[in-house]
Design a protein with these regions (language model features):
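Bacterial N-terminal signal peptides that target proteins for export
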Residues: 1-10
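Extracytoplasmic mature domains of secreted or surface-exposed proteins
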Residues: 3, 21-419
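Bacterial N-terminal signal peptides
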Residues: 9-19
């Protein structure tokens, strides 16, 4: 199984990157953004962006980590330049105390413009990772009204726990990942304390999913306030795993089997592996999970998208009646890392594919029925002579697609925009 995160680090500059775009369809780099559609930002070493969001004013925020395990953020203008109204440089790093490096994996924007980043660190100089959430003001400064000087941690008391996803709902902050060997979910108040009206008075819930281990990579909140988690679980190999909870933290028994859904995406064989890395909820309530799966023992991973009804059943209107699509892209593994729904109901998946010795930024689009949209791509972009990958994507109000991830050698934040 391939992890959807990569421990890389970040050097203090922004500049053009050598890119060669190889679109197979109409999607192409936007030449009005950065240098020929891309920009790179380094934070003093090596590093990578994990996620990206678009502010209402069109400015772009990406978050990840640097070589020291600091949380790292960059904000860009609509043209791809670093926004100097953000911490004076367009960049922010936050050091987290503890005996292990921090890892920032998730990013969300509040309605008031505050920025929430979630991941993991080892607080109080312990060796055990805990959920870690940091909130910033719109100018990039730490929001000292949140947690302890802008930082909050959640200990599930079940061994190590790490956050991989964050979502904002009203005044609540939802954070999901794993604790011990199961799915983990916490709800925080706007001040960064656990919300004790959730999870039987604890503010947290954990769920055993599958047979041995499970991890939630993504989180979305339905219109009715119910949280949906997606990731993977062990079950005769690894499979897409989803859970849905009530607003008070109980597993929602109207979803799947007892609130859980397990999907073998590529088939049943020795070594079958499938991981949901991302999740989106359509306006009609259907749920789209994207990631990757293999379809033969020892075979390459393929980009995967699976659609479920609001009850957790595979959607027979998607993927030629199966509810599932697998797409081979490039000459090796094709990994989906993030998903978004566009204004027409199309499903955009970003990740990476292989071409020769290197990974490339990769975007793919499916129509609302799961058919490959060849008028779009897939499109792959090489970033220098080095591995590159999309780890997060967001769609602007004008339909342009912004992706964030890593590339170059030494490795840096990479942000690109497609039209």
């Amino acid at each position: 199984m391939i992890s959807n995160t990569m421990k890389v680090s970040l050097g203090m500059a922004i500049g053009a990157i050598g890119v060669v775009a190889t679109p197979a369809g109409a999607a192409a780099l936007d030449p009005t953004f950065g240098s020929a559609g891309t920009t790179s930002t380094a934070f003093g070493g090596y590093g990578a962006a994990a996620r990206v969001v678009i502010q209402p004013d069109g400015r772009i925020v990406s978050a990840g980590q640097n070589a020291l395990g600091d949380f790292a953020l960059a904000r860009y203008t609509t043209s791809g330049a670093l926004d100097t109204s953000f911490n004076g440089t367009g960049m922010v790093t936050t050091t987290l105390s503890g005996s292990c490096s921090g890892q920032a994996r998730a990013l969300a924007l509040q309605a008031d413009g505050k920025i929430v980043v979630a991941g993991a660190s080892c607080p109080n100089f312990t060796a055990t990772r805990n959920f870690t959430i940091v909130r910033y003001n719109a100018d990039g400064s730490l929001d000292t009204s949140f947690g302890s000087s802008g930082k909050a941690t959640v200990n599930f008391y079940a061994g190590a726990s790490e956050a991989y996803a964050v979502a904002i709902q009203g005044g609540s902050i939802w954070v999901a990942g794993y604790a011990g060997s199961g799915f983990a979910l916490a709800r925080l108040t706007g001040s960064g304390t656990l919300d004790y009206s959730f999870g039987s008075g604890t503010g947290t819930v954990t769920s055993t999913v599958g047979t041995s281990s499970a991890l939630a990579n993504s989180l979305a909140i339905q219109a009715d306030g119910k949280p949906v988690l997606a990731g993977y679980a062990s079950s005769g190999g690894t499979v897409f795993a989803l859970t849905r909870y009530t607003t008070t933290g109980a597993l929602d028994t109207t979803f799947g089997t007892g609130g859980k859904v397990l999907t073998n995406v590529g088939g049943t064989f020795t070594g079958n592996s499938a991981v949901a890395t991302s999740l989106a909820i359509q306006s009609d309530g259907n749920i789209v999970a994207a990631g990757y799966a293999n379809s033969a023992s020892g075979g390459y991973y393929r980009m995967a998208a699976v659609r479920y009804t609001s009850a957790g059943a595979l959607d027979s209107y998607f993927g030629s009646g199966t509810g599932k699509v697998l797409t081979a892209i490039g000459s090796g593994n094709a990994i989906g890392s993030d998903v978004a729904i566009d204004a027409t109901g199309g499903i955009i998946v970003g990740g990476y594919s292989s071409a020769g010795s290197y990974r490339q930024l990769t975007l793919n689009r499916y129509d609302p029925y799961g058919n490959q949209d060849y008028s779009f791509g897939p499109v792959a972009t090489a970033v220098g002579s080095a591995n590159a990958a999309v780890q997060g994507l967001a769609i602007q109000s004008d339909g342009k697609i912004v992706v964030a991830g890593y590339g170059n050698s030494p490795v840096t934040f990479v942000v690109a925009r497609y039209q």
